[in-house]
């Protein structure tokens, strides 16, 4: 996204604050180039859903609606909290948070196609094109920064960079829903290698920020679909110790 476009957004929202290190080239990893191209467009077309369809997908896959899963972690979070989703695609997670009465919702998405398509699925949510490796916001600007099935697509060697940015931009909470395994494990993805991993992402945050974060809550969600039985996803909530 061009700096003048970001400046225009800043004029339209008192909550949008630029971070001085914004990069011009968003495709700075192999995975980013992959997701910004045709594969990412195809993913967006396959996975774009309206809210009811999205909740039905979660019920079929994990036995719970996404709104119920979110509420189990965020029920006590003030509804005026500023929330940023990194890698929001067309904004389904943000739309779910909006349904739960959160009002200050922001998303950063690498793929321009998904950002444009988000207009079909969301209203009143600020979604911009950008990279999770260089979030264009001031330190501690958000009350909560989250991912939903995004860290699983970041190469393990690059995870520290995106985690640094998430923690930098969060005043208090880091929240995630990701593919889980006790140890980092590569998984083939639609015939491609090097684009999907499962790991203990909450522990990776804790290891990277020793003494700075604490685990508030974590819950494992086993898949109930026959084709996915034995696999787990995890939702976790971390808090800055100094917050």
Task: Give the residues covered by each predicted segment.
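Short, basic, low-complexity termini and linkers enriched in Ser/Thr/Gly/Pro
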Residues: 1-5, 12-24
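Residue-level detector of intrinsically disordered, flexible termini
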Residues: 3-9, 99, 242
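Class I (Rossmann-like) S-adenosyl-L-methionine-dependent methyltransferase catalytic domain
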Residues: 17, 22-136, 154-161, 172-243
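A conserved beta-strand element that flanks and buttresses the S-adenosyl-L-methionine
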Residues: 146
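Short catalytic micro-motifs in class I SAM-dependent methyltransferases
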Residues: 149-153
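Class I S-adenosylmethionine-dependent transferase superfamily signal
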Residues: 166
């Amino acid at each position: 996204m061009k700096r003048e476009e970001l400046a225009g957004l800043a004029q339209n929202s008192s909550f949008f604050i630029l971070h001085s290190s914004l990069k011009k080239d968003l495709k700075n990893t192999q995975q980013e180039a992959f997701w910004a191209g045709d594969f990412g467009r195809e993913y967006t077309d396959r996975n774009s859903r309206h809210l009811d369809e999205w909740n039905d997908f979660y019920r079929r896959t994990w036995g719970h609606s996404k709104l119920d899963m979110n509420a189990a972690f965020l029920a006590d979070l003030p509804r005026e909290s500023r929330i940023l989703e990194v890698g929001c695609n067309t904004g389904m997670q943000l739309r779910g948070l909006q349904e739960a009465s959160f009002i200050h919702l922001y998303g950063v998405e690498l793929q321009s196609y998904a950002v444009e398509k988000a207009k079909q699925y969301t209203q009143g949510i600020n979604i911009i094109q950008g990279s999770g490796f260089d979030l264009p916001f001031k330190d501690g600007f958000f009350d909560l920064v989250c991912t939903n099935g995004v860290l699983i697509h970041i190469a393990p060697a690059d995870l520290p960079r995106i985690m640094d940015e998430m923690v930098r931009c969060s005043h208090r909470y880091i929240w995630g829903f990701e593919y889980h395994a006790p140890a980092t494990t590569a998984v083939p993805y639609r015939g491609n290698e090097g684009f999907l991993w499962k790991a203990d992402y909450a522990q990776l945050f804790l290891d990277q920020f020793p003494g700075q974060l604490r685990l508030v809550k974590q819950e494992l969600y086993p898949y109930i679909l026959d084709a996915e039985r034995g696999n787990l996803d995890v939702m976790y909530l971390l808090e800055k110790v100094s917050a």
